[in-house]
UniProtKB/Swiss-Prot annotation:
Monomer. It is an enzyme of class 3 (hydrolase). This is Peptidyl-tRNA hydrolase. It is found in: Cytoplasm. GO terms for molecular function: peptidyl-tRNA hydrolase activity; tRNA binding. It comes from Legionella pneumophila (strain Paris). TRNA binds at residues 16, 67, 69, 115. Gene3D superfamilies: Peptidyl-tRNA hydrolase.
């Protein structure tokens, strides 16, 4: 099934823009820029939206205007309005359980403690959507997670995350075609 909607998870606002938790939005923003596509605020959809077309595969890109914990609301509104099935959605998000700079493509599964994924699963009524997980590393103890994800990465970590974003963007044409197995083999290797 071809992907018709890519959502980059984030917390909106300049205070959060450069934090680890916004790594998903970094990728979606970079993808739009590389295709000379510009986001426009759509209050009805509760998101900044744009469209790209790669090899005759059109796709909407969304950056929620809601905070991370309410990402599902935005995703549900957009998917219902445009009649997009959960299996046609790719959620791009930060991942504590991957080392900094690793990237993995996954279909379905649980939320793994990620509040954005938790809300998307609840709002869509299923976890059967695709996820592109960008490794941000783990602070070492669960009590440090909140502060860690809302902090800015070091220059070294930021560069590793940017490198992962480049690898993620490289597989988007394959993802949009619906060949998830090939995309997974390429990015998860």
């Amino acid at each position: 099934m071809a992907i018709k909607l890519i959502v980059g998870l984030r917390n909106p606002g300049s205070a959060y823009e450069q934090t680890r938790h916004n790594a998903g939005a970094w990728l979606v923003t970079a993808l739009a820029q590389r295709h000379n596509s510009h986001f426009k605020i759509d209050k009805k959809m509760q998101a900044e939206l744009t469209e790209i077309d790669i090899n005759n595969h059109p796709c909407r890109l969304a950056l929620p205007l809601t905070f991370m914990n309410h990402s599902g609301q935005t995703t549900r509104i957009i998917s219902q309005f445009y009649k997009i099935e959960p299996g046609e959605i790719l959620i791009v998000h930060d991942e504590l359980d991957l080392p900094v700079g690793r990237i993995k493509l996954k279909t379905g599964g649980g939320h793994g403690g990620h509040n954005g994924l938790r809300d998307i699963t609840a709002q869509l009524g299923t976890g059967e959507f695709h996820r592109l997980r960008i490794g941000i590393g783990h602070p070492g103890h669960k009590d440090l997670v909140h502060q860690y994800v809302l902090s800015r990465p070091s220059m070294h970590d930021r560069q590793q995350i940017y490198d992962a974003i480049d690898r993620g963007i490289a597989i988007i044409p394959i993802v949009l075609s619906g060949d998830m197995a090939r995309a997974m083999n390429q990015v998860n290797a």
